[in-house]
Amino acid sequence: MTKFRLRYAPSPTGFLHIGNTRTALMNYLFAKHYNGDFIVRIEDTDLERNVEGAIESQFENLNWLGINADESFLKPGEEKYGKYMQSQKFGRYQELAEKLISIKKAYRCFCTTEELEKDYEDQVAKGIVATKYSGKCSRLSESEIESNLKSNKDFSIRFLVPETTLNIKDFIKGEITFDSKELGDFVILKTNKIATYNFAVVVDDFDMEISHVLRGEEHISNTPRQILIYQAFGWETPQFGHMSLIVDSTGKKLSKRSGNALFFIEQYKNQGYLPEAMFNYISLLGWSPIGEKELLTKQELISMFDDKRFSKSPSTFDMTKMKWINSQYMKALSEEEYLEFTKKYINTEMFNTKEKSEDWLNQVLLLFKKELEFADQINNHLNIFFNEVDVTSETIEILKTIEEHESVIKEFETQISTLNEWEIENIKSLIKLVSENTGKKGKDLFMPIRIASSSSEHGPSLADVIYLLGKDKVLANIAKVK
Protein backbone atom coordinates (compact mmCIF):
# COMPACT_ATOMS: atom_id res chain seq x y z
CA MET A 1 0.00 0.00 0.00
CA THR A 2 1.20 3.53 -0.79
CA LYS A 3 2.52 5.26 2.31
CA PHE A 4 0.14 7.80 3.81
CA ARG A 5 1.67 11.26 3.50
CA LEU A 6 -0.36 14.27 4.62
CA ARG A 7 0.58 17.91 4.89
CA TYR A 8 -0.25 21.15 6.62
CA ALA A 9 0.71 24.09 4.42
CA PRO A 10 0.32 27.48 6.13
CA SER A 11 1.06 30.86 4.61
CA PRO A 12 3.22 33.15 6.76
CA THR A 13 0.64 35.91 6.37
CA GLY A 14 -0.64 35.38 9.92
CA PHE A 15 -0.31 33.39 13.11
CA LEU A 16 -1.56 29.97 14.17
CA HIS A 17 -5.27 30.10 15.03
CA ILE A 18 -8.04 27.64 15.85
CA GLY A 19 -8.97 27.04 12.21
CA ASN A 20 -5.56 26.17 10.84
CA THR A 21 -4.67 24.32 14.04
CA ARG A 22 -7.64 22.01 13.39
CA THR A 23 -6.32 21.43 9.86
CA ALA A 24 -2.82 20.66 11.11
CA LEU A 25 -4.08 18.45 13.93
CA MET A 26 -6.39 16.35 11.76
CA ASN A 27 -3.70 15.81 9.15
CA TYR A 28 -1.34 14.82 11.96
CA LEU A 29 -3.82 12.30 13.45
CA PHE A 30 -4.62 10.89 10.00
CA ALA A 31 -0.94 10.37 9.16
CA LYS A 32 0.03 8.94 12.55
CA HIS A 33 -2.95 6.54 12.65
CA TYR A 34 -1.68 4.91 9.47
CA ASN A 35 2.00 5.13 10.48
CA GLY A 36 2.48 7.75 7.78
CA ASP A 37 4.31 11.06 7.49
CA PHE A 38 3.09 14.48 8.57
CA ILE A 39 4.67 17.29 6.57
CA VAL A 40 4.67 21.03 7.25
CA ARG A 41 5.22 23.07 4.10
CA ILE A 42 5.35 26.86 3.88
CA GLU A 43 3.33 28.58 1.15
CA ASP A 44 5.14 31.92 1.12
CA THR A 45 4.69 33.11 -2.47
CA ASP A 46 2.53 36.08 -1.43
CA LEU A 47 5.64 38.08 -0.60
CA GLU A 48 3.87 41.40 0.06
CA ARG A 49 1.55 39.90 2.69
CA ASN A 50 4.10 37.76 4.53
CA VAL A 51 4.32 38.72 8.22
CA GLU A 52 7.67 38.79 9.99
CA GLY A 53 7.87 36.11 12.67
CA ALA A 54 4.82 34.20 11.41
CA ILE A 55 6.77 31.10 10.32
CA GLU A 56 8.59 30.88 13.66
CA SER A 57 5.29 31.36 15.50
CA GLN A 58 3.64 28.57 13.49
CA PHE A 59 6.34 26.04 14.38
CA GLU A 60 6.65 27.17 18.00
CA ASN A 61 2.92 26.81 18.63
CA LEU A 62 2.57 23.54 16.69
CA ASN A 63 5.38 22.06 18.76
CA TRP A 64 3.80 23.42 21.96
CA LEU A 65 0.57 21.62 21.05
CA GLY A 66 2.46 18.40 20.31
CA ILE A 67 1.79 18.51 16.56
CA ASN A 68 5.31 17.62 15.49
CA ALA A 69 6.32 17.51 11.84
CA ASP A 70 8.13 14.51 10.40
CA GLU A 71 9.36 16.75 7.58
CA SER A 72 9.69 20.52 7.12
CA PHE A 73 12.30 23.01 5.93
CA LEU A 74 13.80 22.57 9.41
CA LYS A 75 13.86 18.79 8.97
CA PRO A 76 13.87 17.94 5.25
CA GLY A 77 12.96 14.49 3.97
CA GLU A 78 14.38 12.78 0.89
CA GLU A 79 15.82 15.04 -1.80
CA LYS A 80 13.17 13.88 -4.29
CA TYR A 81 10.49 15.66 -2.25
CA GLY A 82 11.98 19.04 -3.14
CA LYS A 83 12.03 22.20 -1.05
CA TYR A 84 9.59 22.84 1.80
CA MET A 85 9.19 26.57 1.13
CA GLN A 86 7.51 27.71 -2.08
CA SER A 87 9.78 30.75 -2.35
CA GLN A 88 12.64 28.30 -2.99
CA LYS A 89 10.80 26.61 -5.90
CA PHE A 90 10.15 29.45 -8.36
CA GLY A 91 12.34 27.78 -10.99
CA ARG A 92 10.48 24.49 -10.63
CA TYR A 93 7.08 26.15 -11.11
CA GLN A 94 8.25 28.14 -14.13
CA GLU A 95 9.73 25.04 -15.77
CA LEU A 96 6.48 23.09 -15.37
CA ALA A 97 4.32 25.99 -16.55
CA GLU A 98 6.45 26.17 -19.70
CA LYS A 99 6.03 22.42 -20.11
CA LEU A 100 2.24 22.84 -20.13
CA ILE A 101 2.61 25.43 -22.89
CA SER A 102 4.72 23.00 -24.92
CA ILE A 103 2.00 20.31 -24.72
CA LYS A 104 -0.78 22.81 -25.49
CA LYS A 105 -2.30 22.62 -22.00
CA ALA A 106 -1.51 26.27 -21.20
CA TYR A 107 -0.79 29.51 -23.05
CA ARG A 108 0.71 32.95 -22.59
CA CYS A 109 -1.77 35.72 -21.83
CA PHE A 110 -0.65 39.21 -22.87
CA CYS A 111 -3.80 41.00 -21.66
CA THR A 112 -3.13 44.03 -19.49
CA THR A 113 -4.85 44.63 -16.17
CA GLU A 114 -6.90 47.39 -17.81
CA GLU A 115 -8.03 45.08 -20.63
CA LEU A 116 -9.04 42.37 -18.17
CA GLU A 117 -11.00 44.83 -16.01
CA LYS A 118 -12.82 46.16 -19.08
CA ASP A 119 -13.67 42.61 -20.17
CA TYR A 120 -15.08 41.74 -16.73
CA GLU A 121 -17.06 45.00 -16.58
CA ASP A 122 -18.62 44.20 -19.96
CA GLN A 123 -19.64 40.76 -18.68
CA VAL A 124 -21.25 42.27 -15.58
CA ALA A 125 -23.12 44.77 -17.79
CA LYS A 126 -24.56 41.80 -19.69
CA GLY A 127 -25.84 40.33 -16.42
CA ILE A 128 -23.12 37.70 -16.07
CA VAL A 129 -22.53 37.09 -12.35
CA ALA A 130 -19.73 34.50 -12.50
CA THR A 131 -17.29 36.42 -14.67
CA LYS A 132 -14.34 34.58 -16.20
CA TYR A 133 -11.57 35.14 -18.69
CA SER A 134 -12.76 35.28 -22.29
CA GLY A 135 -9.96 33.08 -23.59
CA LYS A 136 -8.86 35.80 -26.00
CA CYS A 137 -5.13 35.00 -25.87
CA SER A 138 -5.72 31.29 -26.40
CA ARG A 139 -6.67 32.20 -29.96
CA LEU A 140 -3.50 34.14 -30.81
CA SER A 141 -1.54 32.92 -33.81
CA GLU A 142 2.11 31.88 -33.51
CA SER A 143 3.18 35.07 -35.29
CA GLU A 144 1.17 37.23 -32.86
CA ILE A 145 2.76 35.45 -29.92
CA GLU A 146 6.26 35.91 -31.41
CA SER A 147 5.59 39.59 -32.02
CA ASN A 148 4.46 40.12 -28.41
CA LEU A 149 7.51 38.28 -27.07
CA LYS A 150 9.90 40.32 -29.26
CA SER A 151 8.23 43.48 -27.95
CA ASN A 152 8.98 42.26 -24.39
CA LYS A 153 5.30 42.48 -23.59
CA ASP A 154 4.45 41.21 -20.10
CA PHE A 155 2.53 37.97 -19.97
CA SER A 156 1.04 35.57 -17.49
CA ILE A 157 0.55 31.87 -18.19
CA ARG A 158 -3.02 30.58 -18.18
CA PHE A 159 -4.17 26.99 -17.91
CA LEU A 160 -6.29 25.91 -20.89
CA VAL A 161 -9.40 24.46 -19.26
CA PRO A 162 -10.84 21.56 -21.28
CA GLU A 163 -14.59 21.06 -21.54
CA THR A 164 -15.34 18.26 -19.13
CA THR A 165 -17.41 17.25 -16.13
CA LEU A 166 -15.42 16.45 -13.00
CA ASN A 167 -16.82 13.96 -10.49
CA ILE A 168 -14.78 14.31 -7.31
CA LYS A 169 -15.06 11.65 -4.61
CA ASP A 170 -14.56 13.68 -1.45
CA PHE A 171 -14.01 11.32 1.48
CA ILE A 172 -15.96 13.69 3.77
CA LYS A 173 -18.53 15.44 1.58
CA GLY A 174 -19.20 12.53 -0.79
CA GLU A 175 -19.38 12.99 -4.56
CA ILE A 176 -19.09 16.56 -5.85
CA THR A 177 -19.63 17.42 -9.51
CA PHE A 178 -18.13 20.40 -11.34
CA ASP A 179 -18.67 21.61 -14.90
CA SER A 180 -15.36 22.97 -16.19
CA LYS A 181 -17.24 25.55 -18.31
CA GLU A 182 -17.81 27.54 -15.12
CA LEU A 183 -14.10 27.92 -14.42
CA GLY A 184 -12.58 29.87 -17.27
CA ASP A 185 -8.90 29.66 -18.16
CA PHE A 186 -7.09 30.54 -14.94
CA VAL A 187 -3.62 31.98 -14.34
CA ILE A 188 -0.96 29.54 -13.13
CA LEU A 189 2.06 31.87 -13.43
CA LYS A 190 1.68 35.60 -12.88
CA THR A 191 3.44 38.30 -14.89
CA ASN A 192 6.10 38.51 -12.14
CA LYS A 193 6.81 34.79 -12.74
CA ILE A 194 5.42 33.77 -9.35
CA ALA A 195 3.16 30.72 -9.37
CA THR A 196 -0.43 31.08 -8.24
CA TYR A 197 -1.74 29.07 -5.29
CA ASN A 198 -3.58 26.43 -7.31
CA PHE A 199 -0.57 25.66 -9.49
CA ALA A 200 2.11 25.70 -6.78
CA VAL A 201 0.08 23.51 -4.42
CA VAL A 202 -0.38 20.82 -7.07
CA VAL A 203 3.32 20.80 -7.93
CA ASP A 204 4.25 20.61 -4.25
CA ASP A 205 1.77 17.84 -3.47
CA PHE A 206 3.04 15.85 -6.45
CA ASP A 207 6.71 16.39 -5.57
CA MET A 208 6.11 15.39 -1.95
CA GLU A 209 3.99 12.37 -2.89
CA ILE A 210 1.05 13.58 -0.80
CA SER A 211 -1.54 10.79 -0.61
CA HIS A 212 -4.44 12.67 1.01
CA VAL A 213 -5.35 16.36 0.97
CA LEU A 214 -7.40 17.15 4.08
CA ARG A 215 -8.43 20.79 4.45
CA GLY A 216 -11.31 23.18 5.15
CA GLU A 217 -14.38 23.31 2.91
CA GLU A 218 -13.48 26.84 1.78
CA HIS A 219 -11.00 25.07 -0.53
CA ILE A 220 -13.67 23.03 -2.37
CA SER A 221 -13.80 25.60 -5.18
CA ASN A 222 -10.03 25.18 -5.71
CA THR A 223 -10.29 21.41 -6.12
CA PRO A 224 -11.50 21.20 -9.76
CA ARG A 225 -8.71 23.51 -10.93
CA GLN A 226 -6.15 21.44 -9.09
CA ILE A 227 -7.48 18.14 -10.44
CA LEU A 228 -7.37 19.51 -13.99
CA ILE A 229 -3.69 20.36 -13.49
CA TYR A 230 -3.00 16.82 -12.24
CA GLN A 231 -4.75 15.43 -15.30
CA ALA A 232 -2.85 17.72 -17.67
CA PHE A 233 0.47 16.36 -16.40
CA GLY A 234 -0.82 12.79 -16.23
CA TRP A 235 -0.08 12.69 -12.50
CA GLU A 236 -1.93 10.54 -9.97
CA THR A 237 -4.44 12.60 -8.00
CA PRO A 238 -4.43 12.42 -4.19
CA GLN A 239 -7.63 11.75 -2.28
CA PHE A 240 -9.44 14.94 -1.23
CA GLY A 241 -11.44 15.57 1.92
CA HIS A 242 -12.95 18.89 2.99
CA MET A 243 -13.81 19.52 6.64
CA SER A 244 -16.85 21.57 7.63
CA LEU A 245 -16.51 25.14 8.83
CA ILE A 246 -15.86 26.02 12.46
CA VAL A 247 -18.43 28.62 13.51
CA ASP A 248 -18.82 30.80 16.60
CA SER A 249 -21.80 30.96 18.94
CA THR A 250 -23.68 33.19 16.46
CA GLY A 251 -23.25 30.69 13.61
CA LYS A 252 -20.72 32.84 11.75
CA LYS A 253 -17.33 31.51 10.67
CA LEU A 254 -14.96 31.63 13.65
CA SER A 255 -12.57 34.56 13.32
CA LYS A 256 -10.59 37.01 15.40
CA ARG A 257 -13.78 39.10 15.54
CA SER A 258 -15.80 36.32 17.19
CA GLY A 259 -17.09 37.63 20.51
CA ASN A 260 -16.24 35.40 23.47
CA ALA A 261 -13.81 33.03 21.75
CA LEU A 262 -10.07 33.53 21.65
CA PHE A 263 -8.83 32.95 18.11
CA PHE A 264 -5.05 32.61 18.17
CA ILE A 265 -3.23 29.74 19.88
CA GLU A 266 -0.78 32.22 21.43
CA GLN A 267 -3.71 33.78 23.33
CA TYR A 268 -4.57 30.45 24.94
CA LYS A 269 -0.93 29.83 25.75
CA ASN A 270 -0.67 33.25 27.42
CA GLN A 271 -3.80 32.64 29.50
CA GLY A 272 -2.53 29.35 30.87
CA TYR A 273 -4.31 26.68 28.89
CA LEU A 274 -2.60 23.30 28.77
CA PRO A 275 -1.46 22.12 25.32
CA GLU A 276 -2.87 18.63 25.94
CA ALA A 277 -6.31 20.12 26.62
CA MET A 278 -6.15 22.29 23.50
CA PHE A 279 -5.15 19.25 21.41
CA ASN A 280 -8.04 17.26 22.90
CA TYR A 281 -10.73 19.91 22.33
CA ILE A 282 -9.68 20.96 18.83
CA SER A 283 -9.64 17.30 17.74
CA LEU A 284 -13.40 17.20 18.45
CA LEU A 285 -14.25 20.11 16.13
CA GLY A 286 -16.02 18.48 13.20
CA TRP A 287 -14.86 14.98 14.09
CA SER A 288 -15.89 12.50 16.77
CA PRO A 289 -14.58 9.15 18.00
CA ILE A 290 -16.76 6.14 18.73
CA GLY A 291 -18.15 6.25 22.28
CA GLU A 292 -19.02 8.94 24.79
CA LYS A 293 -15.55 9.63 26.20
CA GLU A 294 -14.50 13.26 25.72
CA LEU A 295 -11.18 13.45 27.54
CA LEU A 296 -8.69 11.75 25.26
CA THR A 297 -4.91 11.74 25.15
CA LYS A 298 -2.97 12.31 21.96
CA GLN A 299 -2.13 8.61 21.75
CA GLU A 300 -5.77 7.63 22.24
CA LEU A 301 -6.84 10.03 19.49
CA ILE A 302 -4.21 8.63 17.10
CA SER A 303 -5.40 5.11 17.84
CA MET A 304 -9.12 5.98 17.51
CA PHE A 305 -8.86 8.19 14.43
CA ASP A 306 -11.28 7.25 11.65
CA ASP A 307 -11.54 9.35 8.48
CA LYS A 308 -15.18 8.23 8.11
CA ARG A 309 -16.24 10.04 11.29
CA PHE A 310 -15.94 13.63 10.08
CA SER A 311 -19.13 15.69 10.30
CA LYS A 312 -20.61 17.28 7.20
CA SER A 313 -22.27 20.00 9.30
CA PRO A 314 -20.56 23.11 10.71
CA SER A 315 -18.87 22.66 14.07
CA THR A 316 -19.51 25.24 16.80
CA PHE A 317 -16.51 26.40 18.81
CA ASP A 318 -17.79 26.31 22.39
CA MET A 319 -15.62 28.41 24.70
CA THR A 320 -17.40 27.00 27.76
CA LYS A 321 -16.55 23.46 26.67
CA MET A 322 -12.96 24.47 25.96
CA LYS A 323 -12.65 25.86 29.49
CA TRP A 324 -14.26 22.76 31.00
CA ILE A 325 -11.89 20.40 29.21
CA ASN A 326 -8.91 22.50 30.30
CA SER A 327 -10.17 22.50 33.90
CA GLN A 328 -10.28 18.69 33.85
CA TYR A 329 -6.68 18.57 32.68
CA MET A 330 -5.73 21.09 35.39
CA LYS A 331 -7.34 18.88 38.05
CA ALA A 332 -5.47 15.85 36.72
CA LEU A 333 -2.07 17.50 37.24
CA SER A 334 -0.05 16.36 40.23
CA GLU A 335 0.33 19.02 42.93
CA GLU A 336 3.94 19.56 41.88
CA GLU A 337 2.98 19.96 38.19
CA TYR A 338 0.10 22.27 39.06
CA LEU A 339 2.27 24.53 41.22
CA GLU A 340 5.05 24.74 38.65
CA PHE A 341 2.56 25.58 35.89
CA THR A 342 0.40 28.05 37.81
CA LYS A 343 3.26 30.08 39.28
CA LYS A 344 4.26 31.17 35.77
CA TYR A 345 0.98 33.08 35.49
CA ILE A 346 0.95 34.96 38.80
CA ASN A 347 0.89 38.71 38.24
CA THR A 348 3.89 39.62 40.39
CA GLU A 349 3.21 43.35 39.93
CA MET A 350 -0.08 42.88 41.78
CA PHE A 351 1.06 40.17 44.16
CA ASN A 352 4.50 40.35 45.79
CA THR A 353 5.26 36.66 46.15
CA LYS A 354 8.87 37.35 47.24
CA GLU A 355 7.61 38.53 50.62
CA LYS A 356 5.95 35.17 51.27
CA SER A 357 7.38 31.75 52.01
CA GLU A 358 7.34 29.10 49.30
CA ASP A 359 5.34 26.75 51.52
CA TRP A 360 2.68 29.39 52.26
CA LEU A 361 2.36 30.32 48.58
CA ASN A 362 2.02 26.65 47.62
CA GLN A 363 -0.78 26.17 50.12
CA VAL A 364 -2.64 29.23 48.81
CA LEU A 365 -2.34 28.09 45.19
CA LEU A 366 -3.47 24.56 46.01
CA LEU A 367 -6.71 25.94 47.47
CA PHE A 368 -7.82 26.69 43.90
CA LYS A 369 -6.56 23.60 42.07
CA LYS A 370 -10.08 22.28 41.50
CA GLU A 371 -11.54 25.68 40.65
CA LEU A 372 -9.32 27.04 37.88
CA GLU A 373 -10.43 26.78 34.25
CA PHE A 374 -7.03 28.11 33.13
CA ALA A 375 -3.92 29.18 35.03
CA ASP A 376 -4.24 32.95 34.62
CA GLN A 377 -7.50 32.79 36.62
CA ILE A 378 -5.37 32.34 39.74
CA ASN A 379 -5.00 36.13 39.76
CA ASN A 380 -8.74 36.47 40.42
CA HIS A 381 -8.29 34.70 43.76
CA LEU A 382 -5.08 36.08 45.29
CA ASN A 383 -6.05 39.62 46.23
CA ILE A 384 -7.37 38.80 49.71
CA PHE A 385 -4.11 37.02 50.59
CA PHE A 386 -1.69 39.70 49.40
CA ASN A 387 -3.44 43.07 49.64
CA GLU A 388 -5.78 45.12 51.77
CA VAL A 389 -9.28 44.53 50.40
CA ASP A 390 -12.28 46.75 51.07
CA VAL A 391 -15.62 45.07 51.62
CA THR A 392 -17.90 46.02 48.74
CA SER A 393 -21.33 47.53 49.30
CA GLU A 394 -22.81 44.48 47.53
CA THR A 395 -21.13 42.16 50.03
CA ILE A 396 -22.40 44.27 52.93
CA GLU A 397 -25.93 44.00 51.53
CA ILE A 398 -25.60 40.20 51.39
CA LEU A 399 -24.45 40.23 55.00
CA LYS A 400 -27.48 42.31 56.04
CA THR A 401 -29.84 39.66 54.68
CA ILE A 402 -28.59 37.17 57.29
CA GLU A 403 -30.44 37.49 60.60
CA GLU A 404 -28.32 38.02 63.71
CA HIS A 405 -25.10 38.04 61.70
CA GLU A 406 -23.68 40.54 64.21
CA SER A 407 -23.78 37.97 67.02
CA VAL A 408 -22.00 35.38 64.85
CA ILE A 409 -19.24 37.85 63.92
CA LYS A 410 -18.84 39.00 67.53
CA GLU A 411 -18.52 35.44 68.82
CA PHE A 412 -16.12 34.56 65.99
CA GLU A 413 -13.93 37.57 66.85
CA THR A 414 -13.90 36.58 70.53
CA GLN A 415 -12.81 33.03 69.76
CA ILE A 416 -10.19 34.09 67.19
CA SER A 417 -8.69 36.63 69.60
CA THR A 418 -8.11 33.97 72.23
CA LEU A 419 -6.83 31.25 69.88
CA ASN A 420 -3.17 30.65 70.70
CA GLU A 421 -2.19 27.72 68.48
CA TRP A 422 -2.86 28.75 64.86
CA GLU A 423 -3.61 25.40 63.23
CA ILE A 424 -6.29 24.40 60.71
CA GLU A 425 -7.82 21.78 63.00
CA ASN A 426 -8.04 24.34 65.81
CA ILE A 427 -9.78 26.79 63.46
CA LYS A 428 -12.30 24.10 62.46
CA SER A 429 -12.99 23.42 66.14
CA LEU A 430 -13.36 27.16 66.73
CA ILE A 431 -16.01 27.48 63.99
CA LYS A 432 -17.87 24.55 65.52
CA LEU A 433 -17.75 26.30 68.90
CA VAL A 434 -19.14 29.51 67.36
CA SER A 435 -22.04 27.42 66.01
CA GLU A 436 -22.73 25.92 69.44
CA ASN A 437 -22.56 29.27 71.22
CA THR A 438 -24.81 31.13 68.73
CA GLY A 439 -27.12 28.33 67.68
CA LYS A 440 -26.38 29.12 64.04
CA LYS A 441 -25.42 26.69 61.28
CA GLY A 442 -25.23 26.43 57.50
CA LYS A 443 -25.30 29.70 55.59
CA ASP A 444 -26.31 31.66 58.71
CA LEU A 445 -23.03 30.56 60.29
CA PHE A 446 -20.55 30.33 57.44
CA MET A 447 -21.47 33.42 55.41
CA PRO A 448 -20.94 35.95 58.24
CA ILE A 449 -17.66 34.24 59.18
CA ARG A 450 -16.44 34.15 55.58
CA ILE A 451 -17.29 37.80 54.88
CA ALA A 452 -15.85 38.95 58.20
CA SER A 453 -12.60 37.02 57.87
CA SER A 454 -11.89 37.40 54.14
CA SER A 455 -13.97 40.42 53.01
CA SER A 456 -15.57 38.18 50.37
CA GLU A 457 -18.69 36.00 50.17
CA HIS A 458 -16.96 33.42 47.96
CA GLY A 459 -13.95 31.18 48.39
CA PRO A 460 -12.59 27.68 48.98
CA SER A 461 -12.40 25.82 52.31
CA LEU A 462 -13.18 28.41 55.00
CA ALA A 463 -10.81 27.04 57.65
CA ASP A 464 -7.95 26.90 55.12
CA VAL A 465 -8.58 30.49 54.03
CA ILE A 466 -8.63 31.73 57.63
CA TYR A 467 -5.44 29.80 58.43
CA LEU A 468 -3.54 31.18 55.43
CA LEU A 469 -4.74 34.75 55.96
CA GLY A 470 -3.25 34.67 59.44
CA LYS A 471 -4.62 35.88 62.74
CA ASP A 472 -3.70 39.56 62.41
CA LYS A 473 -5.20 39.92 58.92
CA VAL A 474 -8.41 38.11 59.96
CA LEU A 475 -8.88 40.43 62.96
CA ALA A 476 -8.20 43.47 60.75
CA ASN A 477 -10.81 42.25 58.26
CA ILE A 478 -13.38 41.69 61.02
CA ALA A 479 -12.96 45.32 62.06
CA LYS A 480 -14.12 46.41 58.58
CA VAL A 481 -17.59 44.88 58.99
CA LYS A 482 -18.33 45.65 62.64
Curated annotation (Swiss-Prot):
PROSITE patterns attached to this UniProt entry: AA_TRNA_LIGASE_I
Keyword check for Nuclease: no
GO cellular component, one term: cytosol
Sequence motif 'KMSKS' region, residues: 253-257
Residues engaged in binding ATP: 256
Reactions the enzyme catalyzes: tRNA(Glu) + L-glutamate + ATP = L-glutamyl-tRNA(Glu) + AMP + diphosphate
Motif residue range(s): 'HIGH' region: 10-20
Enzyme Commission numbers on file: 6.1.1.17
Keywords carried by this UniProt record: Aminoacyl-tRNA synthetase, ATP-binding, Cytoplasm, Ligase, Nucleotide-binding, Protein biosynthesis
Listed GO biological process terms: glutamyl-tRNA aminoacylation
Keyword hit for Nucleotide-binding: yes
GO molecular function: ATP binding; glutamate-tRNA ligase activity; tRNA binding; zinc ion binding
Annotated compartments: Cytoplasm
Subunit structure, as described in the record: Monomer.
Family from the record: Belongs to the class-I aminoacyl-tRNA synthetase family. Glutamate--tRNA ligase type 1 subfamily.
Job description of the protein: Catalyzes the attachment of glutamate to tRNA(Glu) in a two-step reaction: glutamate is first activated by ATP to form Glu-AMP and then transferred to the acceptor end of tRNA(Glu).
Protein name in UniProt: Glutamate--tRNA ligase
Lineage of origin: Bacteria, Bacillati, Mycoplasmatota, Mollicutes, Entomoplasmatales
Annotated gene: gltX
